[in-house]
Design a protein with these regions (language model features):
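Short, surface-exposed acidic
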Residues: 330-335, 384-391, 433-444
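Substrate-recognition/cap regions that form aromatic- and gly/pro-loop-enriched pockets
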Residues: 370-386
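Extended, non-catalytic structural segments that build the interaction scaffolds
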Residues: 68-82, 292-325, 330-332, 341-366, ...
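Extended, compositionally biased alpha-helical segments that mediate assembly or anchoring
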Residues: 441-484
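Extended, helix-rich architectural segments
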Residues: 1-158, 480-484
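Assembly-interface segments of oligomeric complexes
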Residues: 409-453
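Extended, charged amphipathic alpha-helical segments
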Residues: 5, 212-348, 385, 397
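Extended, regular secondary-structure scaffolds
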Residues: 137, 141-142, 147-237
Length: 484
């Protein structure tokens, strides 16, 4: 990392002048409104965007507790309207939190050139990128896509903005090349249309079909994270949450009907009289309700015997399929008990979760590489130059939040280090107790130097003591000689 003495403000000014000095015809054409409005107004109405936004809206509604079970009708019971049970389970939120935390609850580790890693860790800390990574993972798991724009704020701090999925419209050409990005939303109070159009070199802001601001794009198009499972339009990720919603609807429907059956048939059964009822006076001193029936008549409660085994079989199978599709160990949400589990058993228990999350991690690693390129651009504008060799040494690794036997792992790494098969830096990289490798290496080096200085000081003290003893011995001999 090398600092340039050139004023970064002047460098930024040159970049702006070069951008607007000779705008090409395509840029001018983009700002001209045609008979059908601007090009981006028709772009967001295309089927591929409408299809994706409708999926996002359905997921948002479900996460806001707007489930299909709420449409279940009431019925008449004992001459009154019986309000049916509408049990809503928000298990999907727990599934999203689990996968998000599994991927990013432990901060990612940067490895490579020691000096650059230390510098980037400071950039990550100032820009609150641990939280940004969590937001990216949550958007990706929930909707199949995530969008991040890297920028330089007013205080010259590198930050990222996570653009909401329902406001995001990535644009690609007929060859599948990502060429621009539209951020669109409608103001809830004024109902005004707001557009932010991202080009590779500039950002334009429109309010009610009027261009109100144009800014220089110092980085590039928003980073597009996309899941490996694709939707009908293969550029967009397919949210796996949509696979869980039908299963959850079935579970809610079964539980709601079961609740109604218990309430009506078991707790409030219907009374049935067979025969003729006699209307005659009843003594006033009798407590309670009495039915006068003619001889041979009968009164009993009508109740239904529920097939418990069949209900349990269906419900258990649906729940089993739900956790299989969600790729979550059933013990996480209290469906089974786990005790005295070995390291091998934990690995097997989380194998499906690992395979599921590795796909998202691969997409995020690709996006993080793009983020580092954008950070490099912003650092160059600030006067900090990074060589290709140093920049290419940087890599990002994820520390998934899987329960592991840390004692066993540290013991194995210690054995490898003692055999000369692993360095201290690799141990620090893989250790669950450290996140900043370069800082730990600096501290270890400082401790080593301090110990050497202490050892050297002790050695000098010992040497001085030996010399003093030798001098004392010579003096004694001289004194004895003179005495003789």
């Amino acid at each position: 990392v090398k600092n340039e003495k050139r004023n970064p403000i002047l460098k930024l000014g040159d970049h702006i002048k070069g951008l607007f000095k000779n705008p090409d015809r395509r840029k001018v054409k983009d700002r001209i409104m045609g008979d059908n409005g601007y090009w981006f107004e028709s772009e967001i109405k295309k089927n591929k965007h409408v299809d994706r936004i409708s999926r996002i809206s359905s997921i948002d509604e479900y996460l806001r507790r707007e489930h299909a079970i709420l449409a279940r009708p009431n019925f008449e019971f004992k001459g009154k309207t019986f309000e049916t049970a509408k049990i809503i389970l928000q298990t999907l939120k727990s599934i999203i939190r689990f996968h998000t935390g599994y991927i990013c609850s432990n901060p990612v580790s940067l490895t490579g050139d020691k000096e650059l890693v230390s510098f980037l860790n400071k950039v990550y800390k100032k820009g609150s990128y641990n939280k940004t990574d969590m937001e990216v993972a949550k958007e990706l798991v929930s909707y199949g896509d995530a969008f991040e724009y890297v920028y330089l704020d007013d205080n010259d701090i590198i930050r990222s903005k996570i653009i909401r999925n329902k406001d995001s419209y990535p644009v690609y050409d007929g060859h599948g090349t990502y060429i621009s990005f539209i951020e669109y939303w409608k103001d809830e109070e004024t109902r005004e249309d707001n557009y932010v159009i991202y080009y590779p070199d500039r950002v334009e802001v429109y309010e009610n079909q009027k261009l109100v601001d144009t800014k220089v794009n110092l980085t590039g198009l928003p980073i597009w994270y996309s899941a490996m499972d694709k939707s009908r339009y293969d550029k967009f990720g397919d949210p796996f949450i949509l696979d869980l919603i039908p299963l959850m609807d079935t579970i809610e429907n079964l539980l709601s009907k079961l609740d109604d059956a218990v309430t009506t048939l078991s707790l409030n059964p219907l009374g049935v009289v067979s025969g003729q009822r006699i209307d005659s006076s009843i003594p006033n001193n009798i407590v309670g309700t009495v039915l006068n029936l003619e001889d041979g008549s009968d009164f009993k409660y009508a109740s239904a015997d529920m097939d418990r085994d069949s209900i349990k079989l269906e419900l258990d199978y649906i729940i089993q399929q739900f956790f299989s599709v969600a790729c979550v160990p059933s013990s996480i949400l209290g469906q089974s008990n786990v005790s005295n589990v070995s390291e091998t058993s934990i690995t097997m228990l989380y194998q499906q979760t690992d395979n599921f999350c590795k796909q998202y991690i691969a997409s995020m690693q690709e996006g993080f590489a793009k983020r580092l390129e954008y950070m490099r651009k912003l650092l160059e504008i600030k006067g900090i130059t990074i060589t290709d060799e140093v920049f290419d040494s940087i890599s990002v690794s994820f520390n998934v939040n899987r329960p592991v036997d840390n004692k066993s792992d540290m013991k194995n790494m210690k054995m490898q280090h003692e055999c000369g098969a692993m360095s201290k830096q690799t141990i620090i990289d893989r250790s669950p107790y450290t996140t900043d490798t370069s800082l730990e290496m600096e501290r270890i080096e400082a401790e080593r130097i301090k110990e050497e200085q202490n050892t050297s000081g002790d050695s000098q003290e010992v040497n001085r003591t030996d010399a003093d003893m030798e001098t004392d011995s010579k003096l004694e001999n001289m004194i004895d000689g003179k005495a003789d």
